[in-house]
Design a protein with these regions (language model features):
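Short, solvent-exposed loop/turn elements at domain surfaces
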Residues: 182-188, 246-249, 290, 374-375
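Conserved SGNH/GDSL esterase-like catalytic core that processes O-acyl groups on lipids
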Residues: 193-325
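Histidine-centered active-site loop/cap adjacent to the catalytic His
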Residues: 464-501
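Alpha-helical cap/lid subdomain in secreted, periplasmic
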Residues: 264-477
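Secretory targeting and sorting signals
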Residues: 1-28
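Short, hydrophobic/glycine-enriched beta-strand segments
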Residues: 172-184
Length: 501
């Protein structure tokens, strides 16, 4: 045994000179291959097609008929007044340092990497040196908007390689103001459960007082814009509220919805002097009394000549007279809003507000109202107690951009009446005033529903883009509002205006 060990030891010793003469293998030459993307700010982590929840979600059954009344924390991905902030945590959108950018070195070859971020000749940030591994090859930095040079340095042994990337950090700040057609009324997050199961229903809203939902068209447009490019991100400030008017909503408090300040003030409190890129606004329907029209038409035949049964039109001798008076006031009301978009303005109570800061080239996108009056074959609806003549009148004198003056209305009995149309239509006033103010209306919201050969109104069955009567009791607020498909179309048309197909 001893002899065998000695022989083995001698053999190993004799091999040592040979091993020492082998060359040391050089480290592989480094390759610098980097990329960058903006971290999405309008997130859809569960890929359901809608921006994720606000500051809190039901502890269970969020999308069921009866969600839990206990809320738990979740990521804040929509900035809204009256957010449900679990634990009082502030939202990410208040970060004054800027917006998150993800830098990736995963396609590089080497041992370690570092990013150097500069503007002109000034280095603004250098990341810690990290190893190139699957778990460590990405790093996130927070940067203000602007133009940058991202320099990736990859090291391998004593060698290094460098790659320079030019980048523009851009976050679109989008603000959504307005009424129920913008807030997503009728479309709580758990609407699918109600549509498929019916029965007792507790709607889960992002904001209970305003019946605001991420299923609303402006929120869907924000997500479309977010997903259109990895080199930009989108921050949505969502303040639209069901029931809003110019003075009770946009320029003043809306106590019935729990809003103690105007939407302009609410947005200002959230973003301060940060510049807005896109602002959508849906307003006018409640100002002119559209709900009063629907209620009266449901209860009275020949409703344009009937006395309105609810405010605000009950203050006038008949529905038609009240509508024309109210539509005639709308351009001046919209003009009072305009100064708030870019400078100081006067609120509804006469007090002064610094208004909202608008970036150079910002877009103000007024939203006309869609056509809810036609059947799938294009003819006027006859729905519940509202007959075709009154649906035709409502379409022609409220929703179409232009109308004959006078308007020939044929009541159920007697001769045709020539109804004065000196103030035009609701949508006509929106389009005309938008042109005067330099706003860019989302024409497609009207044309997709109103100019198409197929009707998408409340009686259009599977082609309907609007709810009919959603219930006698309980969940009634969605009646005569855009349904799931209708809000999808609104989101699509808003996105088109900002260049997203």
């Amino acid at each position: 045994m001893l002899r065998r060990v000695v022989i083995t030891s001698l053999a190993v010793t004799n091999c040592l000179p040979l091993l020492l003469t082998l060359p040391v293998q050089a480290a592989p030459a480094p390759v610098a291959s980097g990329s960058w993307v903006m971290v999405p700010q309008s997130k859809d982590a569960n890929s359901d097609g809608f921006i994720d929840g606000d500051g809190g979600v039901p502890a269970s059954g969020a999308l069921a008929l009866q969600p839990s009344t206990t809320y738990v924390g979740a990521g804040n991905y929509i900035a809204q007044p009256n957010e449900r902030l679990i634990g009082g945590a502030l939202s990410w959108y208040l970060d004054p340092a800027g917006y998150p950018v993800q830098l990736t070195a995963c396609a590089s070859t080497g041992a370690n990497y570092v990013w150097t971020i500069s503007q002109g000749q000034t280095i603004v940030k250098t990341t810690p040196e990290r190893t190139i591994k699957k778990k460590t090859c990405k790093t996130t930095v927070t940067l203000p908007e602007g133009d940058y040079n991202f320099k990736l340095t990859v090291k391998s042994g004593n060698a290094k390689r460098v790659q320079n990337l030019t980048a523009t950090v851009k976050n679109y700040l989008m603000v959504a103001l307005g009424d129920s057609y913008a807030s997503g009324e009728g479309n709580p997050r758990n609407i699918e459960a109600w549509l498929t199961q019916a029965g007792s229903f507790s709607p889960y809203w992002d904001d209970d007082g305003c019946n605001r939902s991420a299923r609303g068209g402006p929120a869907q447009a924000a997500l479309r814009l977010e997903q259109s490019s990895p080199r930009t991100s989108v921050t949505l400030i969502y303040a639209a509220c069901s029931g809003a008017t110019v003075d009770r909503g946009i320029l003043g408090p809306q106590p019935a919805a729990g809003a103690s300040t105007s939407q302009v003030e609410q947005v200002r409190s959230l973003i301060g002097t940060r510049g807005i890129d896109i602002l959508t606004i849906s307003i006018g329907g409640n100002d002119v009394g559209f709900q009063s029209v629907l209620t009266t038409c449901a209860l009275a035949a020949n409703c344009p000549t009937a006395k309105a049964v609810t405010l605000p039109l009950s203050e006038y001798q008949d529905v038609q007279t009240g509508l024309q008076a109210r539509i005639g006031q709308l351009p001046a009301s919209l003009a009072r809003i305009a100064p708030c978009f870019g400078g100081p303005c006067t609120l509804g109570n006469g007090s002064k507000s610094p208004g909202l800061v608008m970036n150079v080239g910002a877009s103000v996108l007024p939203m006309p109202y869609p056509d809810i009056t036609r059947a799938a074959n294009g003819s006027a609806c006859s729905y519940l107690t509202i007959d075709q003549a009154d649906f035709t009148w409502a379409r022609d004198t409220i929703l179409t951009p232009t109308a004959p003056n006078p308007y020939p209305y044929q009541p159920s009995r007697g001769q045709s009446l020539a109804l004065p149309m000196n103030s035009g239509t609701l949508n006509g006033a929106i389009f005309t005033t938008a042109s005067t103010l330099g706003w860019n209306p989302v024409v497609g919201i009207w044309s997709a529903s109103g100019d198409s050969s197929t009707g998408h109104g409340v009686c259009a069955a599977d082609s309907a883009w609007a709810f009919g009567l959603t219930g006698i009791t309980g969940f009634t607020s969605g009646s005569f509002h855009p349904n799931v498909k209708g809000q999808e179309v609104i989101g699509r048309e808003i996105a088109k205006v900002v260049g997203v197909q």
